[in-house]
Amino acid sequence: MKKKNWIYALIVTLIIIIAIVSMIFFVQTKYGDQSEKGSQSVSNKNNKIHIAIVNEDQPTTYNGKKVELGQAFIKRLANEKNYKFETVTRNVAESGLKNGGYQVMIVIPENFSKLAMQLDAKTPSKISLQYKTAVGQKEEVAKNTEKVVSNVLNDFNKNLVEIYLTSIIDNLHNAQKNVGAIMTREHGVNSKFSNYLLNPINDFPELFTDTLVNSISANKDITKWFQTYNKSLLSANSDTFRVNTDYNVSTLIEKQNSLFDEHNTAMDKMLQDYKSQKDSVELDNYINALKQMDSQIDQQSSMQDTGKEEYKQTVKENLDKLREIIQSQESPFSKGMIEDYRKQLTESLQDELANNKDLQDALNSIKMNNAQFAENLEKQLHDDIVKEPDSDTTFIYNMSKQDFIAAGLNEDEANKYEAIVKEAKRYKNEYNLKKPLAEHINLTDYDNQVAQDTSSLINDGVKVQRTETIKSNDINQLTVATDPHFNFEGDIKINGKKYDIKDQSVQLDTSNKEYKVEVNGVAKLKKDAEKDFLKDKTMHLQLLFGQANRQDEPNDKKATSVVDVTLNHNLDGRLSKDALSQQLSALSRFDAHYKMYTDTKGREDKPFDNKRLIDMMVDQVINDMESFKDDKVAVLHQIDSMEENSDKLIDDILNNKKNTTKNKEDISKLIDQLENVKKTFAEEPQEPKIDKGKNDEFNTMSSNLDKEISRISEKSTQLLSDTQESKTIADSVSGQLNQLDNNVNKLHATGRALGVRANDLNRQMAKNDKDNELFAKEFKKVLQNSKDGDRQNQALKAFMSNPVQKKNLENVLANNGNTDVISPTLFVLLMYLLSMITAYIFYSYERAKGQMNFIKDDYSSKNNLWNNAITSGVIGATGLVEGLIVGLIAMNKFHVLAGYRAKFILMVILTMMVFVLINTYLLRQVKSIGMFLMIAALGLYFVAMNNLKAAGQGVTNKISPLSYIDNMFFNYLNAEHPIGLALVILTVLVIIGFVLNMFIKHFKKERLI
């Protein structure tokens, strides 16, 4: 067994020796002596100095122009022939400094262009051009580098001064051009105002004059018409239209004989029917029934023969008896009893209210509910005002009356909602006074969001509809021009043929001389055109009908037919629909909550008034006790009233008796009449004699009727004449009204055109004002800080004379050109190999001697855990001691500056502890596999070192753990990056390695691990 262990040890030792020799040969071959390279670069003069340029500058904008001074600086260096410059990334430059590819790295910072163009700043910030030299360079190389950087910087500063002067001159030229443009725009606006709006307004009163004249003329004709019509009606005699009703006018003369015969025949038939039906009438039954009813009435009347005095006497006796009973009743409550009862009842109620737990609980519950209600109400008001970070839509904008009017409300509504906004501000101030500063609330600033909500135009769009009929003999082409801010959906129908709504030219059928145009579609606003659309808030669609391919002859006086069908939709009202409704809803909700808040605000929590309640209850009981006497008097008054009304009651009874008597008399008369009818039916009826000579009376009636009709005809002729005259006047009135309607339409069209022109002119003037204001604002900034009061701004002067300064990125290493330094790569490699040897020593001891037990087994059940912790501590302490020794040696070799030594030694100690703990764990736990992993990490590091070329870092660097340690030491020694995060990570890895070594699992049988 021991022989086998020594074989393992020998193999591992050989592997380590081979790795060390290979590493030394590789490092010597790759890096060599940097001091020797420095001497060679001096001997090969300046053209052997390689300078890496790292351009991190970001472009900026000045006076509307893009400025990239980083590129200009690189172009300036390209003209330098004495040195070799290369533009690379920062990682490539740092790698080049590390492996000797570059001797100098010049870094153009990110804000280089922005800081260089601070011509308008009062105190410009300094611009620094950063540079760094490679570690271990000779002093002569460093001096030459400083000289190169200084010379290039001086030349570049001269160019910057020229750029500043050019910029100032350009600003003056731009100002001159803008002033000329302002004058041109003002002249154009004045000319357009005169021709486009002022002259049409001067002609506008003439339209009112024409309308007034036509209105007066039409009024005169209407007055004359009504006067004539009234005169005709008044002159007409109503008797003229009255027909003599003594004659049967409905019977026509030419049919009188035939009708007379028909009537005579009908009469004969009626007599025959009478004779045949009279026997079927049973009058005896009716007469007997009425006699029986008459006898019943006699019996009832005999029973009601009591006189009026008897009725009256009976009623009086009953009322007197009732009055005596009521007067005999006395009140059971004396005055003393009432006062004693009042006192006892008051004391009892006071005691009950004071000791009633249910009542106290109810009062406390009311107080708690009121407090909870006030708290909830304040929260609702807070939520109504404040805009939450998420998609909250129940907040209130700080809008003024003008903002509401601009959003589409009338003045009354704007005043109403402005008052609600003021209430919100008032509540906000009260709320902030009660709350700490961190909980203060504010209304959301309003930036025209409500008046510029284009969501409905983007999602729903606007309907585009138009119907037009165009007549022309020479139109053969349609040109469609759509608004570039909108996407159009739909079609254009030309005589039933469909075309899409898009920019296009369509050849029309020339056989038609009439084109029926129908436009039906939807225009949706493009999201990326929202800003441009809000400038005029109008959607345009132009349909231009014209004649294509026509070449006008010089003598051809016939103009080309062009019909422009343009649709212009001003969508100002659509921009505030949804957002305005949402805002008004939020304001209404706040107003309702605020009214409840003001109603409950002034109420104080007063104690419950028990005394008032007790007095009210006692007074109610006492009043009922004292009201007995009043109730008795009221009943006696009612009895007296009944006695007074007894006569009327008796009269009603007697009147009913009289009505019964009258009914009896009527029945007797009816019986007598039926007896007479019975006698009449018993007799035979006489046939009437018809006088045939009565026909002459019909002739007389015909003559009279003819006279009446003649009179009516004369009057109707006169009325027809008057009607014709009225028609003539009505036609004249109609013509005047048509002319008046045309004048009104013309007046309306002119007013609408003037409104459109005024809006166009207003938009142009507003645009000119905006451009002028922008120019004044921008021109005001030009060199506004060139003076500090009455004196020249010395800071700006110093900046413009020497804007860019150099800044040396110092290294942690002492830059001694006569001293050789060790590479961080070799340093990290030696540390890792030392940790591998240490780990193998611990592993070999444990295999030979067994696990280290510092505490006896019979001491405690937790001895194994304590032994493992002590073992991990010993391993970690070994790494700490080795790290301290290696750190002190490396500090002297690297010549670390005094202020950086403590951190450097701490980094070395933590790195060494991580290496020792992790490698020891791998060997103790997974043995041969652990050794393989350790050698694999070392091999990856070798491959990564071979890939450290100027081309950049490869994938191997990203997966090699030792490469990260190498970069950490390199960055620290070159003062490139802070190491705080690196120290934290190393500390965490030390803790992990310590814990892993505490939990080693030992296997009973030998396995691969």
From Swiss-Prot:
Record's keyword terms, sorted: Cell membrane, Membrane, Transmembrane, Transmembrane helix, Virulence
Keyword Membrane: yes
One annotated Gene Ontology cellular component of this protein: plasma membrane
Entry membrane topology: Multi-pass membrane protein
Cell compartments where the protein resides: Cell membrane
Transmembrane segments: 7-27, 822-842, 869-889, 903-923, 928-948, 979-999
Origin superkingdom: Bacteria
UniProt cross-references to InterPro entries, sorted A to Z: T7SS_ABC-Transporter (IPR051328), T7SS_EsaA (IPR023838)
Family to which the UniProt record says this protein belongs: Belongs to the EsaA family.
NCBIfam families: T7_esaA_Nterm
Other remarks on this protein: This strain lacks esxB and esxC.
Role played: Component of the type VII secretion system (Ess). Provides together with EssB and other components such as EssC and EssE a secretion platform across the cytoplasmic membrane in the host.
Summary of subunit composition and partner proteins: Homodimer. Interacts with EssB.
Protein name: Type VII secretion system accessory factor EsaA
